[in-house]
A protein has these predicted regions:
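Compositionally biased, low-complexity flexible segments
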Residues: 5-27
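Substrate-binding N-lobe of the ribokinase-like
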Residues: 30-38, 44-45, 67, 71-138
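Conserved phosphate/ATP/ADP-binding segment of small-molecule kinases
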Residues: 187-278
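Conserved post-catalytic alpha-helical subdomain immediately downstream of the catalytic base
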Residues: 259-260, 284-341
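Positively charged, low-complexity intrinsically disordered leader regions
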Residues: 2, 23-63
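Short acidic, glycine-rich surface-loop motifs adjacent to enzyme active sites
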Residues: 177-189
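Conserved phosphate-binding/catalytic loop of the ribokinase/pfkB sugar-kinase fold
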Residues: 128-134, 139-176
Length: 341
């Protein structure tokens, strides 16, 4: 981890062991997986920057209502932590067989050290700035009978020194990667996103963005932006038909100078807009169990396939397949190259 000037922290713990450590794991597969470009993906170097989180799950049984208030009582039987936000994007990049590097901000706390430890275990090179003035962003979910009953969020906006440290890390790493992925969850790590995109452009590294908010001007100069249906409506308003969507999408793409704009549309599939026009694929999910983290998987798949040299339409088809797989899993999950067959 990168510790901010003047900070004291626990060295040698799980977080310290992960600093700058790790490398791609599980990339020694021979041949291709029924068309998935395993060899090319193994050479892909993907840098993920953005809002790093820890997703914490408490699983238990519900067999009574509390006498104190009309709420269920969960008898917790198991706890599980998973990488979330930008860290989940990096986890998916590594699971697909590419070389994943993660830059972000964590707190000087147990969740932050666990993020670093989980990243190392996943084969991710984690370069994390430590901000002792804020907690690591943590989303805690309580589940009973495989259903989510409650979510509790712990989060604060990072300070300027932490953002300065993030800039230093990004500057050092961008040029040695094939693609930069920006995972924006509006938690503050990408407050200076315009400058980050400009640095990547100067280095000749394409930028893929999972956006937040309704002002997409801050993403001007990226190669690809991937809003979901709701986010696209925030940005351009509701559309009455496919023709109106295409008109507004192409106008937005032109205003931002994007190579491509991909709208993910849940059960309606995905629609890609480029200079060549409109391309669409239908959704592939057979059963939707949990959509949390699905956008992370889609973004990671787009990044590794694009870095491997695939054209946008083909990258979209692989991303659609990955998204259809991951929504059938509980919680923030990954898709591997083997599952893409």
């Amino acid at each position: 981890m990168t510790r901010l000037p003047g900070e004291q922290g626990a060295a040698g713990g799980p977080g310290g062991a992960a600093a700058g450590a790790g490398g791609p794991q599980g990339r020694a597969q021979a041949g291709e997986v029924l068309g998935f470009p395993v060899r090319a993906v193994a050479r892909a170097r993907v840098l993920v920057a953005g809002d790093v989180m820890l997703d914490r799950y408490w699983f238990g049984e519900v067999d009574r209502i509390s006498p104190e208030a009309p709420v269920p009582v969960v008898r917790v039987a198991r706890r599980e932590d998973r990488l979330g936000g930008a860290a989940n994007v990096a986890r998916n990049v590594a699971a697909l067989g590419a070389q994943a590097t993660l830059v972000g901000i964590v707190g000087d706390d147990e969740p932050g050290r666990h993020v670093a430890e989980l990243a190392r275990e996943a084969g991710i090179r984690a370069e994390l700035a430590v901000d002792a003035g804020r907690p690591t962003t943590l989303k805690m979910r309580v589940l009973g009978r495989q259903q989510q009953l409650l979510r509790v969020d712990f989060e604060e906006t990072p300070g300027e020194p932490a953002l300065d440290a993030l800039d230093v890390l990004s500057d050092r790493l961008i040029a040695s990667h094939d693609v930069l992925v920006l995972s924006d969850y509006a938690k503050g790590a990408l407050k200076r996103v315009e400058a980050l995109i400009e640095r990547a452009r100067r280095a000749g590294v394409p930028v893929l963005v999972d956006p937040k908010g309704d002002d997409y001007r801050r993403y001007r100069g990226a190669a690809l932006v991937t809003p979901n249906r709701s986010e696209m409506q925030q940005a351009v308003g509701r559309w009455s038909d496919e023709g109106q969507l295409a008109e507004r999408a192409q106008r937005l793409r032109g205003e931002l100078g994007l190579e491509a704009l991909l709208v993910t549309r849940s059960e309606q599939g995905m629609t890609l807009f480029t200079d060549a026009g409109r391309d669409h694929v239908d959704a592939q999910a057979h059963e939707v169990f949990d959509v949390s983290g699905a956008g992370d998987t889609v973004l990671a798949t787009l990044a590794v396939t694009r870095a491997a040299g695939l054209a946008w339409p083909e990258a979209m088809r692989w991303a659609n397949r990955a998204g259809g797989i991951v929504v059938g899993k509980l919680g923030t999950s990954i898709v591997t190259a083997g599952e893409m067959s």
